[in-house]
Amino acid sequence: MGRRPARCYRQIKGKPYPKSRYCRGVPDPKIRIYDVGMKRKGVDEFPFCVHLVSWEKENVSSEALEAARIACNKYMVKSAGKDAFHLRIRVHPFHVLRINKMLSCAGADRLQTGMRGAFGKALGTCARVAIGQVLLSVRCKDNHGVHAQEALRRAKFKFPGRQKIIVSRKWGFTKFNRAEYTKLRAMKRIVPDGVNAKFLSNHGPLANRQPGSAFISATSE
């Protein structure tokens, strides 16, 4: 018996049903890699960021997420190069899908109980997505922004429903606008922290210290 089509599970119904000690025997999700490309590049390297945003409330299967990741990664490697981007999958397939297998042969009513005890067994996993939720994000240099948008456009065909490609006003994966990030970086109020950035606050007794040394202990001064 083949895999049931994902259109049967597209609508969100009922409560979330995650894997637990009560829900056993769940197949592993098809997607196992959520960060692709130069994921160790610093926050200053890739200022451009673009998102693929869901425009419907629906379930997205792990197979669709893996297909979108492969399509986006393949185009970016071919057009921009494998060292020129960082792709991140922003949703995780934690919701377990169930199936109540039914026989369709002659005399099936003698072998099964029909809809009695029809809770079903685990079939696969999916991600429950809301309207406006980000599915995929790509950060890169400004000159590869066109390639990133085209890569997400190709990945969009792997998902059901409607999605939008939105160019972010933020600097990379951070929460700071580009102009704000540049200004705070020049003032040394922002410290790079991997793919993100840490803001050095000026509240409290630390306000009298020099910018960039807010977390230095008093013993080292």
Curated annotation (Swiss-Prot):
Gene3D superfamilies: Ribosomal protein L10e/L16 (3.90.1170.10)
Single GO MF descriptor: structural constituent of ribosome
GO cellular component, one term: vacuole
Cross-referenced InterPro entries: Ribosomal_uL16, Ribosomal_uL16_CS_euk_arc, Ribosomal_uL16_dom, Ribosomal_uL16_euk_arch, Ribosomal_uL16_sf
Example of a GO biological process term: developmental process
A Pfam family of this chain: Ribosomal_L16
Transmembrane segments: none
Record note on quaternary structure: Component of the small ribosomal subunit. Mature ribosomes consist of a small (40S) and a large (60S) subunit. The 40S subunit contains about 33 different proteins and 1 molecule of RNA (18S). The 60S subunit contains about 49 different proteins and 3 molecules of RNA (25S, 5.8S and 5S).
PANTHER family reported for this sequence: 60S RIBOSOMAL PROTEIN L10
NCBIfam families cross-referenced by the UniProt entry: PRK04199.1-4 (NF003239), uL16_euk_arch (TIGR00279)
Record protein name field: Large ribosomal subunit protein uL16x
